């Protein structure tokens, strides 16, 4: 069933508010802060419909709604506008990597650290030998989704054992250059609040994946073009 324009605008408003606050979004909030031009009752009815269609879900602890992975994917594919890196940021990032003139392994580690800083997330990368590079673990500790020690422990433990990266790689199809994954797709309960944006890089004898781990509500409009730029930059700098 295709969504109406009103439903699309409502879904966009709910998701962008959820990305901003990490809290379930109620009809009153949308009515006050979004210029949808409809009554609170209409907003509530449409939220019920979007829930029935699988785009939203209601938490046990709140009357508000949060997006499902289906809702987030629809937002990314159909509603979201990417926010490209500024030219100043692109130049600064490129200069920092080029000026180091490092061997590939050090450059990949350096790239991962800069990506973590740029996205305020946990950045990961692999090389052709399967070695894993990670940076920004402290970043996720500031996010409400990772206040749950069991979730954080699961992510860091699986990363340490390479299980998490193996699970992500297994989800990437051969023709895909960039993929958005949600924790529930990996079938691991403690990863359900997580989101992943990963891309491939390949040049000469070096290939692997590069990406970030964060909450499922991460700001994909910023993260996707950033991860894509880092992959393209890395491919151009591979020695």
Positions of PLM-derived features:
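Short alpha-helical segments that sit at the start of domains
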Residues: 1-12
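Alpha-helical hairpin
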Residues: 2-3, 38, 67, 85
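Residue-level marker of regulatory loop/turn positions in helix-turn-helix DNA-binding domains and
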Residues: 3, 23, 144
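Conserved RecA-like P-loop NTPase ATPase core
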Residues: 10, 68, 212
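N-terminal helix-turn-helix
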Residues: 13-20, 24-78
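Intrinsically disordered, acidic Ser/Thr/Pro-rich low-complexity regulatory segments
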Residues: 73, 80-239
């Amino acid at each position: 069933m295709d969504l109406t324009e009103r439903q699309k605008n409502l879904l966009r408003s709910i998701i962008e508010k959820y990305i901003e606050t990490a809290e379930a979004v109620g009809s009153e909030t949308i009515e006050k802060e979004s210029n949808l031009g409809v009554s609170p009752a209409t907003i509530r009815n449409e939220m019920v419909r979007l829930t029935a269609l699988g785009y939203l879900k209601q938490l046990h602890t709140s009357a508000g709604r949060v997006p499902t992975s289906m809702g987030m994917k629809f937002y990314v594919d159909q509603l979201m506008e990417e926010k490209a890196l500024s030219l100043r940021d692109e130049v600064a990032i490129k200069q920092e990597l080029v000026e180091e003139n490092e061997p590939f392994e050090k450059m990949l580690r350096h790239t991962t650290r800069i990506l973590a800083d740029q996205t305020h997330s946990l950045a990961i990368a692999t090389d052709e030998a399967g070695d894993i590079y990670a940076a920004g673990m402290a970043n996720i500790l500031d996010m409400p989704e990772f206040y749950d020690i069991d979730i954080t422990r699961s992510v860091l433990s699986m990363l340490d054992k390479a299980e998490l990266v193996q699970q992500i790689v297994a989800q990437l199809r051969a023709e895909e250059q960039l993929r958005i994954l949600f924790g529930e797709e990996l079938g691991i309960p403690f990863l359900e609040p997580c989101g992943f944006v990963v891309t491939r890089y390949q040049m000469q004898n070096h290939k692997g994946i590069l990406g970030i781990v964060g909450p499922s509500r991460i700001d994909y409009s910023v993260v996707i073009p950033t991860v894509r730029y880092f992959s393209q930059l890395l491919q151009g700098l591979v020695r």
